[in-house]
Amino acid sequence: TGFIYEGKQEFEVISNRVDSLPALPMKIMMNVGNPDRAFDFARLPNEGVGLARLEFIINRMIGIHPKALLEFNQQDAALQEEINEMIAGYESPVEFYIARLVEGIASIGSAFYPKKVIVRMSDFKSNEYANLVGGDRYEPEEENPMLGFRGASRYISESFRDCFALECEAIKRVRNDMGLKNVEVMIPFVRTVKEAEQVVGLLAEQGLERGKDGLRVIMMCEVPSNALLADQFLEHFDGFSIGSNDLTQLTLGLDRDSGIISHLFDERDQAVKILLSMAIKAAKAKGAYIGICGQGPSDHADFAGWLVEQGIDTVSLNPDTVIDTWLYLAEAHG
């Protein structure tokens, strides 16, 4: 449903020349999830992709739980029939999953080549994985999936390692077979330094060794422990990309999806800023990459300005906010 307005509505047209935008003290990157729009978004002024979400590709282009494909022969006849209809034309269920991931990642990687494209490995929560075809057979029922079986904990678990291996295979094909070495890896929701060590080791086992062929492995800085122990986490990664959404929720102890307390959600809260400053300073001291890909800078230009003052390397924005935020930062900090 929509709205019907009586009479001719007034509107304003704002034109900007994107080929002559003023210089900035940091780089503007973009958050891109939809491979179908990648070449459109690449026409905007940018320094690459600070966040490419695998979840969008899995949801939009695959729609099937990876375990249901790995264990296709063990599924009941009804599920096999449903899956067969979805994977028609592919060599095998597993090849369907990998090939579709490759298609999505390569679309974004090639659209922005040779600029960096940081691909975040899947960050579905258990309830989101359960919504995929066959997913309800494999996912636990959790009271609070936000704090549950996700991120690095999921990758290194015995029950999901073979699923994570499919994502790694897709990244390898994009980088090695297609030559898109601009595609880099990002790991979300790393709770402890031990997990950091384990997940980087697992990547190496899967053929994605940090530093080999120029591969950078970035970590999402989105758990308070990441900022508090930034020096230790950075021993295992080439830098941080701050996820301000989860970091804010976990710092303030709130669920931003709760209508009762959602008004308290603000990335500009002083407690959040203290953690952000700690992470930025630690990365700068080590000469490591430090960027942000959370929603905050897209929603609040003044927050983006504050991040610039802290010395952040890159701010990754939603495509529809790139021009306005660029102009704001140029005026305030150019």
Q: Model segments located where?
A:
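Beta-strand/loop-dominated core regions that host nucleotide or nucleotide-derived cofactor-binding catalytic loops
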Residues: 8-9
